[in-house]
Amino acid sequence: MSLSRTQIVNWLTRCGDIFSTESEYLTGLDREIGDADHGLNMNRGFSKVVEKLPAIADKDIGFILKNTGMTLLSSVGGASGPLFGTFFIRAAQATQARQSLTLEELYQMFRDGADGVISRGKAEPGDKTMCDVWVPVVESLRQSSEQNLSVPVALEAASSIAESAAQSTITMQARKGRASYLGERSIGHQDPGATSVMFMMQMLALAAKE
């Protein structure tokens, strides 16, 4: 079983929905350790992504993901725009001309996208950033691919891993970004970027079941 282009479009549509619904929650998280604008930025960015989907829904997956990345780069403020934009642009390079993705191809897409984020943000696991979710998600997909699991099962597992990983940032001290200025006071708060990655994985798991 593979993930279809239509399911990718549904995923991005669901991301638009979740970032609208959870905008205030994400901004609340960011208020504790950041600029108090993460939820607003993600909502604005994915609203723009969803607006553009009808005109490109018949294109290949790589085209759709690149368009998503460029839209996020141009419409999301702060550090999140470049990081999430980079993820989708790098993911697009791994999915050029594809109408569907096997689990192995999905793993490669996430691996390349996450590598782009890590390279651009210069963060490592344990820094209390979205990389604390991307890294275990990629590893989960790699293991699922090796075990020849179905795409829906693999993405459900990755979604569960993402939730646990996002929650794990609560006990971390931030070493990157504005949150790092707080030192030990950053401990006890969940990272908003990591939480956004969690929401994205939850939405992909749902889209894969459709």
From Swiss-Prot:
Which cofactors?
A: Mg(2+)
State the species of origin: Escherichia coli (strain K12)
Positions of the DhaL domain: 6-206
- Gene that codes for this? dhaL
Q: How does it assemble?
A: Homodimer. The dihydroxyacetone kinase complex is composed of a homodimer of DhaM, a homodimer of DhaK and the subunit DhaL. DhaL also forms a complex with DhaR.
Q: Indicate which residues the UniProt annotation says bind ADP.
A: 38-41, 79-80, 121, 130, 178, 191-193
Tell me what this protein is called.
PEP-dependent dihydroxyacetone kinase, ADP-binding subunit DhaL
Keyword Cell wall biogenesis/degradation attributed: no
Temperature-related activity data read:
Complexation with ADP increases the thermal unfolding temperature from 40 to 65 degrees Celsius.
What reactions does this protein catalyze? dihydroxyacetone + phosphoenolpyruvate = dihydroxyacetone phosphate + pyruvate
Induction, as annotated: Activated by DhaR.
What positions does the entry give for Mg(2+) binding?
30, 35, 37
